[in-house]
Regions:
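Extracellular/surface-exposed low-complexity segments
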Residues: 1-55
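Hydrophobic lipid-interacting interfaces of membrane-associated proteins
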Residues: 181, 233, 284-286
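Outer membrane beta-barrel transmembrane domains
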Residues: 154-157, 247-350
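Surface-exposed loop/turn motifs in large extracellular/passenger domains
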Residues: 170, 200, 221-223, 274
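Solvent-exposed loop segments that connect transmembrane elements
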Residues: 240-244
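Solvent-exposed flexible segments
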Residues: 208, 222-235
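Outer membrane beta-barrel translocator domains of Type V secretion systems
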Residues: 34-216, 327-330, 334-343, 347
Length: 350
């Protein structure tokens, strides 16, 4: 509504000012450039240490009953005698989880027994039983809060071995085993009620190697044994709902893993009690997957895909029917991964 010079009123319609051309096209020559502003990334969420305890339990169950041929004692046992054996082992592992936010320290104890049920010439078939326990402590590097995890497991399995040479001191060998395990798991945070859930695994392993006699003396010999082992683990865990409503499911772990190494050992040729020392070096290649989902968010353990192992120990032959062995091993990997273990075993021919 506009009043003109004669005092008359009338309506006027007109366009307003257009948009700023520098807003429409900042590249125009008359426009002053504006420095871009980097987007602000939200800080990573602070996680409860209980998440690391669930992941530690999963890792412990996967590796508790991992089995190699030499875990059943020395190959150098000629004849058609069947053998019964037993071994105890203990290990300590340190690794991180969820991008290094959580520190995991765990110990595992194992008892495994077995016996040949069929032995003929260069081949044997047997059964084995195992029982183990793992305890872990998880501390948040951000808050300092902690949680604990525990796994109790049992396993049953079968194994079979064939060697080109009857006493296993020359030529090729093939070893295989199948195992089935069940685990009772427990997780507890500070001031919280314990959480219980079940898991299970099925594993298959195939190992092969070749033994070379590199030195022969009058009463002893030295051997080099390259080894290759492939293993597959199918791991399953029950869907679990915590008392606070958190849902833990979609366990993704296990899969195919491999081991490539060499074992150097001495072997006495004299009768009676004989000590046979050995050294071993291994490259361990894992599946690289160890995750769980917490309310739909996937979290993982920082267990390296590549690990490197050193072994040392000795086997003691006690006459014709008894033998014992013991050894230690150290594994190292990225992200501060460390695993130190040892075992003792006893073997009897019958």
């Amino acid at each position: 509504l506009v009043k003109d010079a004669n005092g008359n009123w009338y309506l006027r319609s007109q366009t307003g000012a257009g948009p700023d051309p520098c807003v429409v096209d900042p590249s125009l020559p008359e426009c002053v450039p504006i420095d871009p502003v980097d987007p602000v990334e939200p800080p990573p969420p602070v996680l409860r240490p209980e998440a690391g305890a669930y992941l530690a339990n999963q890792s412990a169950a996967l590796n508790m009953f991992a089995h190699r041929m030499h875990d059943r004692g020395p190959m150098t046992a000629p004849g058609d005698d069947r053998h019964a054996w037993a071994r105890v082992g203990r290990g300590n592992v340190d690794f991180s989880a969820v991008g290094g936010q959580l520190a995991v320290d765990g110990t595992t104890s194992l008892l495994q027994i077995g016996s040949d049920v069929l032995r003929t010439g260069n081949a044997s078939v047997g059964v084995m039983l195992g029982s183990g326990r793992a305890d872990s402590s998880v501390v948040s590097r951000v808050t300092g809060y902690s949680a604990k995890g525990r796994v109790r497991g049992t396993a049953v399995g079968v194994y079979g071995t064939w060697s080109q040479d009857a006493d296993g001191t020359q030529g090729a060998y093939i070893d295989a085993n199948l195992q089935f395990g069940r685990f009772d798991n427990r997780v507890q945070g500070i001031g919280l009620e314990p959480e219980h859930y079940d898991s299970r695994m099925a594993s298959a392993s195939l190992e092969t190697g070749y033994t070379f006699n590199v030195w022969q003396g009058t009463a002893s010999a030295l051997y080099v044994q390259p080894q290759l082992q492939l293993s597959h683990v199918d791991f399953r865990a029950d869907r679990h709902v915590e008392s606070n409503g958190t849902v833990i499911d979609h366990a993704d772990a296990g899969g195919l893993s491999g081991r490539l190494g060499v074992r150097v050992f001495g072997h006495g040729t004299a009768a009676g009690n004989t000590v046979q020392p050995y050294l071993g070096v291994n490259w361990l290649r894992g599946s690289g997957t160890s995750t769980l989902q917490f309310n739909g968010d996937t979290l993982g353990a920082d267990v390296p895909r590549n690990r490197y192992e050193m072994q040392a120990g000795a086997e003691l032959k006690l006459g014709q029917r008894w033998g014992t062995w013991g050894g230690v091993s150290v594994q190292r990997g990225d992200h501060g991964y460390r695993n130190v273990g040892g075992q003792l075993g006893l073997r009897m021919a019958w």
